[in-house]
Amino acid sequence: MANNEDSNSNGLDSFDAVKQRFKDRSKKVVQTRELLSKQAVQTREILSKQAVKIAKQAEEHERFINKVTHLVGVLGFGGFCFLLGARPQDIPLVYCFFYVIFVPLRWIYYRFKKWHYYLLDFCYYANTIFLVDLLLYPKNEKLFMVCFSFAEGPLAWAIIVWRCSLVFSSPDKIVSVLIHLLPGLVFFTIRWWNPATFAAMHPVGTDRRVSWPYVEDKAYLFTWLFLVPLVVYTLWQVLYFLIVNVLRRQRLLRDPEVMTSYRELSKKAEKANNKLWQLSGLLGDQNRIWMYILFQAIFTVATMALTVPIFLSYRLHVIFQILKISAAVWNGGSFLLEVMPRQVIQKEKKKKAEMQPIEEQILHHEAVSHPTENEPKSTET
């Protein structure tokens, strides 16, 4: 009997020991969990504070970069204007330098942003032809006139119609303006201000232009300033359609983030529900791209036709240069005074919405970590 009691007491002792061991382990688990929870809270708090700090530093760096870009842009444009008056014969070289440096950089940037199909647009196609003319065939009269038609036709009027903005704090906008503006200035200087061209057009002791560029024949002018450029433009349109809408169609359908000129124009027109969107839908949504091609063809034909009187009149050509530059500056002012403030307000709202949960979390953790005097503190029992 005594043995049974001893065995029972031993069993109870061992059971109590096991139970105590489980309690100790549970207590350790709870303590470990509390410790890890505190560490997680502290880590979260540190990361939240760092996120706020990084956001403020990024904003300061962005402002500094914008100021530097604005400074460089203003000085660069001022230097170009000085060079335009002091040494107009060097403007073609400046343009070639600009194209060789900035267009490849733009391709890299646009590739990263999935905008690289923009580089298949007509303005880049035409600028490539300009580069070939200036570097390889600078005395080819016919190619010069084709380039003149492109530069002072579709490219020049795009500044006005598509509202290209001269914003010195935006490298992308500066490059966009210069791609459309510089070619016209280049061929303006060659046409009227280049001393070598002056000598060719007005030989000493004669009133006739006996050499390049020979422009007396109106049929000759019409052919090389309108008909031939129109054929070259049509070739580009066919190639563009084959590449973007046939060969790369599936790629574009798989990735809606990849942008093309048609996608951008259609999105903006649909959002604004403007005349362009309404007219492009006359033949149905499935035929909108054909309507855009038609509109672009009409725009190109009209602007190329205007290059003939511009080519013949120095005064008209000067007025047109002033009009282009004024339009780019006006659009830039509109962007700075109207569009940019709205963008800043939207950006601030978005940033506040993103940072508000983080700030609330920080305040909550501080309140939990540092209770006020009126709040009861936990006591061990």
UniProtKB/Swiss-Prot annotation:
GO cellular component: membrane; plastid
GO biological process, one term: phospholipid biosynthetic process
Subcellular location: Membrane
Pfam families: DUF2838
GO MF, one annotated term: glycero-3-phosphocholine acyltransferase activity
Membrane-side (Lumenal) residue stretches: 85-89, 138-141, 195-223, 313-315
Entry keyword set: Acyltransferase, Lipid biosynthesis, Lipid metabolism, Membrane, Phospholipid biosynthesis, Phospholipid metabolism, Transferase, Transmembrane, Transmembrane helix
Reaction(s) the record says it catalyses: sn-glycerol 3-phosphocholine + an acyl-CoA = a 1-acyl-sn-glycero-3-phosphocholine + CoA; sn-glycero-3-phosphoethanolamine + an acyl-CoA = a monoacyl-sn-glycero-3-phosphoethanolamine + CoA; sn-glycerol 3-phosphocholine + (9Z)-octadecenoyl-CoA = (9Z-octadecenoyl)-sn-glycero-3-phosphocholine + CoA
Cytoplasmic side: 1-63, 111-116, 163-173, 245-291, 337-381
Annotated membrane topology: Multi-pass membrane protein
Major enzyme class: transferase
Spans traversing the lipid bilayer: 64-84, 90-110, 117-137, 142-162, 174-194, 224-244, 292-312, 316-336
Enzyme Commission code(s) on record: 2.3.1.-
Protein family per UniProt: Belongs to the GPC1 family.
Function per UniProt: Glycerophosphocholine acyltransferase (GPCAT) that utilizes acyl-CoA to acylate glycero-3-phosphocholine (GPC), forming lysophosphatidylcholine (LPC). Shows broad acyl specificities with a preference for 16:0-CoA, polyunsaturated acyl-CoA, and the hydroxylated ricinoleoyl-CoA. Also catalyzes the acylation of glycero-3-phosphoethanolamine (GPE) with acyl-CoA. In addition to acyl-CoA, GPCAT efficiently utilizes LPC and lysophosphatidylethanolamine (LPE) as acyl donors in the acylation of GPC.
Listed name of the protein: Glycerophosphocholine acyltransferase 1
Gene: GPC1
